[in-house]
Amino acid sequence: MTASLLKAELHCHIEGAAPPALVAAQAEKYGIDASSFIRNGSYVWEDFTSFIAAYDFVASVFRTEEDFAALAEAYLIELAGVNTIYSELFVSPDHGEAVGLSAEAYIEGLAEGIVAARIKTGIECRMVIIGERHLGPENVLRRAKWLADYHHPLITGFNMAGEERMNRVADYAPAFDIAREAGYGITIHAGELCGAFSVRDALDLVRPSRIGHGVRAIEDADLVQRLADEGVVLEVCPASNIALKVFEDYASHPMRDLTDAGVRVCINSDDPPFFATSLANDYAIAASMGFSDVEIDAMTRTAIEAAFVDEATRQNLLQRLQAAGSGDEAAI
């Protein structure tokens, strides 16, 4: 049973973690009609394009520092309740700016929620700044430059998400160079909607230590071997992959094939209520796919080893995992 296992998550978009009931309440608070995006207590979307539209709507009903603080605190307390000891939240200041909130105010609100959750539960959390791919290379470059000049102790990484089929990875490489030179950890969404070539482009042009999703690397055996050889960690989101029809079902999901080939992976929920999942559920899904508790513990260790966090905190997290009877096996 995975319920008792300690957990860690590296891939979750904060607005995408907002439950429909909270979003409906926020919409009512601001006099916004949510009926096009929430029906019968669930989010309404049909494909990736409509999912992005629904996500943007959800983001639009959080409008103040207090709103974002409450969102971050609620999600982290939920995670802590299922034995999660570490979380990285993907945060996009573009969403704050879209509702008239400065990037700095957006971050400070989220940080307030993170600190409150840590005080109440002990969960550690860091933020990874997102550049939105579908807003174009210049916008992502602007975000990286902002990040290089804005130092916050809870911001430790840079990422790019959004519509993977727009533009070339090469168009965004300068933004990642800026973030890397400023000392931030690098991850990037690839190998989800697009095939193995997008993972290869990410490795060649962005040089990340982690890749968000990356599961379509399975289409290229040489690329799978390269991932294994280089130790790049895939942030795998099983329920998300099925909901977005990246794979037809869990039987055809390549997580087992990837781990058998020596690729390092960890378990994540992505945008949980959009995909009728949670981190606890994705851990249970991994078990249903045939992974043992020992293997799943190793994935949690991998997540902590790959986390964008200072070494003192990393070692503390690893010690907590060890003390719980986990982490004795070699990381997957």
Swiss-Prot record:
Substrate binds at residue 271. The active site is at 192 (proton donor). Its cofactor is Zn(2+). Keywords: Hydrolase, Metal-binding, Nucleotide metabolism, Zinc. The keyword Mitochondrion does not apply. Pfam families: A_deaminase. One of its GO terms (biological process) is hypoxanthine salvage. InterPro entries: A_deaminase_dom (IPR001365), ADE (IPR028892), Ado/ade_deaminase (IPR006330), Metal_Hydrolase (IPR032466). It catalyses: adenine + H2O + H(+) = hypoxanthine + NH4(+). Zn(2+) binds at residues 11, 13, 189, 270. The record marks 213 as: Important for catalytic activity. Binds 1 zinc ion per subunit. It is an enzyme of class 3 (hydrolase). NCBIfam families: aden_deam (TIGR01430), PRK09358.1-3 (NF006848). Belongs to the metallo-dependent hydrolases superfamily. Adenosine and AMP deaminases family. Adenine deaminase type 2 subfamily. This is Adenine deaminase. The lineage of its organism: Bacteria, Pseudomonadati, Pseudomonadota, Alphaproteobacteria, Hyphomicrobiales.
